[in-house]
Every structure is written in C-alpha cells, then in structure tokens.
A protein has these predicted regions:
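Pocket-lining segment of extracytoplasmic ligand-binding domains
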Residues: 75, 84-185
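Beta->alpha turn/N-cap motifs
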Residues: 16-20, 30-49, 57, 142-152
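Short, polar/charged alpha-helical segment
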Residues: 1-11
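Extracytoplasmic
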Residues: 9, 29, 37, 49, ...
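Hydrophobic/proline-rich hinge and linker segments of small-molecule sensing/allosteric domains
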Residues: 55-79, 176-179
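Extracytoplasmic/secreted proteins, especially bacterial periplasmic and envelope-associated proteins
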Residues: 3, 22, 26, 40, ...
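An extracytoplasmic/periplasmic, membrane-proximal ligand-sensing/linker region
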Residues: 171, 177-251
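Surface-exposed patches in mature extracellular/periplasmic domains of secreted proteins
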Residues: 12-17, 120, 203-206
Length: 251
C-alpha cells in the first residue's frame, strides 16, 4: 500500500476489522472504500452492497488455495462418510476455508452435520481448530491447507501422527473488493495500480492476504469464477448453517 501511495498517489488508511462481519459493514456503510476478505465474506459484501471485485493475489501462477479436513492417523477415519458419529472442530462461521467449504464437503459426502456429527466445536480460527485436533479434543478439524502446512513447519502438527482426510477443490484467493460508489476514474486508477505494482517494486514487498509474499495481483480475475466457487456452497443454506451453529452450542 505504501508503494502504491508513492507511485500512484492513492493514499490508504489501513484499518483491521474486529470480525468478518465488521469488515463487511465497514465497506457497506461507506466507512471503507476497499476491503480484503475471504471468498465467502466477499460474497456477503457483494450481496449486501454490491461490492466490486478488484483483484486476487497470485502465487507461483496460482490464484487459488485449498481447504482441508484433518484427523489423526490412528482415528480409524478414512473418508468423510466415516465422520458420522465423530466430533469436528472448525473456525469462524464466516471463514471460507475453516468453516464453509469444509461443511460443504461434509454435506456432499452425505453427512448432515447437525444430525450426524456427535459434536461440533466452533474454535474461532484455523489455529484453534487445528489445536483442538492435536490436543485430542475432537476427532477431526477443518482449516486451510496454508494453516495446516504452517502448523507442520512450526512443529505444532506431527505429520507422522496426523493426516489429511479431505482436500477441497481450488478456492479463489482472498479477494480485494471496492465500494461500488467510488468514482469511476478512481476505480480505474486503483485497478491499474494493483495490476502493475509488482513491476515497480522489489518482489519481497508484494504481499497477499495475511501478509504472505505473493507474485502479483490479478485485477482481471473473472467474477464468474469467484461466483462459481461460491455456488459450490449452495447446500450450506442459512437454515443448515443455523442448525450447525445451534449444534455447536450444545453442551
């Protein structure tokens, strides 16, 4: 953002939302002009106030990442169908890869989360979801592959004891979105800046969602692909999601 300010004269006042919902409200209440979300949260912002897709970050030629469900190697669980009667930890209900896509995979496997899972733990984050598994509090856990691989590298997860149970299809990298009410000339200037900033600065300064190093930003990522990914969540309706959250509240 500092580089874009210096080169293109577009100034930013960066603020961290207290929650996924707060980040959406900030854009839709016109307290923010640009937001950076997961795909699901972007979908909410688009539905509520017509947030426009600005860009997704690209790493090693890929503009997607993956969600996963994990379990211990001695759990006896070898397929998603075998989660029936087991316990599952997930992240925040608005999280694309630690809640929404994992439950979409569970539903696709014929499992009704609220009825068929013994217990659901809403851990609140990828890290906490993984911790619930490694500490033996649940049979399986959901988190992004990035979070899982980071936990393995840090020694939090012992790969000799835990395994990937299921991996999602590619999920669009967390998109940058713009308030639709911005002036057209400013929108064009912002798009140009994000599309070519990687050619103007040292590559180590190009950062993606969460601060990871990326190659560039793709400002021409098709909206149809973003919406297509969100369509895969169609079975996870508001009713089903409500039942899951209610189940998680049971003691």
């Amino acid at each position: 953002f500092n580089a874009i300010t210096k080169i293109y004269g577009v100034h930013f006042d960066v603020k961290l939302g207290s929650s996924y919902a707060a980040a959406v409200q900030g854009l839709c209440n016109e307290q923010a002009d640009i937001g950076w979300y997961g795909a699901v949260t972007y979908g909410q912002a688009r539905e509520i106030c017509g947030a426009e897709l600005l860009a997704v970050d690209v790493k090693k030629g890929n503009a997607v990442y993956y969600s996963g469900i994990y379990t211990s190697k001695n759990s006896g669980i070898n397929s998603l169908k075998e989660l029936k009667g087991q316990s599952l930890a997930v992240g925040d209900p608005n999280s694309t890869s630690s809640f929404n896509f994992p439950f979409a995979m569970v539903l696709a496997a014929g499992i009704d989360p609220a009825k068929d899972l013994k217990k659901i733990v809403i851990a609140g984050s990828h890290t906490n979801s993984i911790a619930a598994l490694t500490e033996g509090r649940v049979s399986a856990a959901a988190a992004s592959f990035n979070a899982w691989e980071k936990a393995v590298k840090k020694g939090v997860v012992d790969p000799t004891k835990f395994k990937v149970l299921a991996k999602s299809e590619g999920i669009p990298n967390p998109p940058l979105a713009m308030n639709k009410k911005l002036a057209p000339a400013l929108k064009a200037k912002i798009r140009l800046a994000f599309s070519e900033i990687h050619t103007k600065v040292d590559p180590q300064f190009i950062r993606g969602y969460g601060g990871k190093t990326v190659d560039r930003y793709d400002t021409k990522y098709p909206l149809s692909m973003m919406l297509g990914a969100l369509d895969k969540l169609s079975a996870l309706t508001k009713r089903v999601k409500g039942e899951i959250i209610e189940k998680a509240g049971e003691r």
